[in-house]
Amino acid sequence: MGGTPERFDAQYRVLIDRISHEVPFYRFHLKAASLAGTYVINDPFWWSADEKFFGYSLATRIGVKVPRTVLLPSKSYIPSIDPQRSLRNLEYPLNWEGITHYVGFPAILKPADGGGWKNVSRVNNLPELHQAYDASGTLAMTLQQFIDFDEYVRCICVGKEFILPIQYDPKRRCYVEAEHYLTPALEKQVLDGAWALNHALGYDMNSVEFAIKDGVAYAIDFTNPAPDMDVHSILPKHFKLVVEAMARFAVTCAKEGRSNHDGFPFRQYLESPKPRPPGHGEGFAARPAR
């Protein structure tokens, strides 16, 4: 890929994107490739719009349990922001007593749109929360109930239907090779939750993490369009299963001629016949009411 003209023919039926969150050029190129007929995994339009706090809000509405979570305004802003004009609708100071009463301690302070364990802090009391929040800079943050889990599971998901639950240790940030660590009831809860989230979010490639406490699986992190699927991370036997599942899914997408355009207004303008404006092309303009 190099200089990309606005009109180009698709060279591929399917592209699997695992880098555009770090290299913006790829994201821009993939959107245009999608217009040209390539099916991109994951959908670059939705990936650009998605973020973690929306995911928590969505999960609560589709019946997937999540920890109590509060979205927080940024602590600081770029110099061009005038607090008196641009921030006059923000509550200040924040109602920390009400926020912490709802979430409880300990809690996790993390970016509302982040990943890779960056800028994540565990806070045990209000002074620790203030210290971590004051250091968060211009990031919009979330404060989330900490689940003191009995088990922790990360599901690698491909094509919305293939779901591979693997025991995970978030303290050491590594997978654990274990068998039969979930009861049938817990396994069903995890698989059903991951399935619902993948379908609701529209992800063809994702990882969904659950913290399990007292028989309840809480979805902790599930908006991961480029999940860690490296052979050194997920263990060779799991890596083989995931690669095979992704290969089968990519071939299926290519054969079916899938599109990323479903639900987007521009789709109808890429088809024939195209919609026509009122007056059947004779021209129209907005006029003030009399």
Identify the function of each model-found stretch.
Residues R173-A219, L241-E244, R248-R258, R267-G279, ...:
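A long amphipathic alpha-helix within ATP-dependent nucleotide-binding catalytic cores
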Residues S20-H21, T223-F239:
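Glycine-rich phosphate/pyrophosphate-binding beta-alpha loops
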Residues P5-F8, E51, S76-I78, W117-K118, ...:
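Short secondary-structure boundary/hinge segments and terminal tails
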Residues S136-A140, F146-E177, L191-S207, A211-Y218, ...:
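Phosphate-binding core of ATP-grasp and ATP-grasp-like enzymes
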Residues S34-G37, F45-V153, G159, E179-H180, ...:
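Active-site nucleotide/adenylate-binding loops and adjacent lid/helix of ATP-dependent enzymes
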Residues Q11, K65, G202-D204:
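Short loop/turn motifs at secondary-structure junctions
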Residues M1-I41, F45-D50, F54, I78:
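ATP-binding N-terminal substructure of ATP-dependent carboxylate-amine bond-forming enzymes
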Residues L15, I41, I108, S207, ...:
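Generic enzyme active-site microenvironment
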